[in-house]
């Protein structure tokens, strides 16, 4: 199966966008999952709901909210451009942001479930033996949560690969800049004679998703085996 240059461009851009989206959202995913599991504070239920909103909102709505907040004239985007010269709307950076926002709830949910399975008594025992909060987190909590972190990361990566609605609303469908696999397929489907190209990208998407899930299962199994030793 031979891809054309524009198709390769879409595949490579999708991999770049998905990888960066996961890379930048992972620290926040771990933090918010830990916050929801280990802390009690006013507004916790509200925070939980806000974090999971992208799962239930139409992607176009999320893209519109990003556009009005992070666009050149948005209340956040305008300041980012004036102070740092950074723009998100209609650029690959915006595609990364849209993918990160849409995939974030899946990441948080997987990590949260793993954290809920960690025995709090292990952390308490380490604290009574003199270990500090950060040392307990990095030597006990994080290693025991690693399988969930891996699963959440791969799920977020796979979700980012398939992101379309928020992306096309926020950053449009610019070849070489924001045209990811779903956007390229959308264009090809609407183009006479583009069915074969859309089919090739469809096969690539399925293959990437399957590979991601298989790698996730393999890494999670290795992590569980090491944690059980």
Curated annotation (Swiss-Prot):
InterPro entries: MetI-like (IPR000515), MetI-like_sf (IPR035906), ModB_ABC (IPR011867)
PROSITE patterns, alphabetized: ABC_TM1
Membrane side Cytoplasmic: residue ranges: 38-49, 105-136, 223-229
Record-annotated ABC transmembrane type-1 domain positions: 11-219
Residue intervals annotated with topology Periplasmic: 1-16, 71-83, 158-201
Localisation per UniProt entry: Cell inner membrane
Topology in the lipid bilayer: Multi-pass membrane protein
Protein name per UniProt: Molybdenum transport system permease protein ModB
Source species: Escherichia coli (strain K12)
């Amino acid at each position: 199966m031979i891809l054309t240059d524009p198709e390769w461009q879409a595949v490579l851009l999708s991999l770049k966008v998905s990888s960066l989206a996961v890379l930048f959202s992972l620290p926040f995913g771990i933090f918010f999952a830990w916050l929801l599991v280990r802390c009690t504070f006013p507004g916790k239920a509200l925070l939980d709901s806000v974090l999971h909103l992208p799962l239930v909102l139409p992607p176009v709505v999320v893209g519109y909210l990003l556009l009005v907040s992070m666009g050149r004239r948005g209340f956040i985007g305008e300041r980012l451009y004036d102070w740092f010269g950074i723009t998100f709307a209609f650029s690959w950076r915006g595609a990364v942001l849209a993918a990160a926002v849409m995939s974030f709830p899946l990441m948080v949910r997987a990590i949260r479930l793993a954290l809920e399975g960690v025995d709090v008594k292990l952390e308490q025992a380490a604290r009574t033996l003199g270990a500090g909060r950060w040392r307990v987190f990095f030597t006990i909590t994080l290693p025991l949560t690693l399988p969930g972190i891996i699963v959440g990361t791969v799920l977020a990566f796979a979700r980012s690969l398939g992101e379309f609605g928020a992306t096309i609303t926020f950053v449009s469908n610019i070849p070489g800049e924001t045209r990811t696999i779903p956007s390229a397929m959308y264009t090809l489907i609407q183009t006479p004679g583009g069915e074969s190209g859309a089919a090739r990208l469809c096969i690539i998407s399925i293959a990437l998703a399957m590979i991601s899930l298989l790698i996730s299962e393999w890494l999670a199994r290795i992590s569980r085996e090491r944690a059980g030793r």
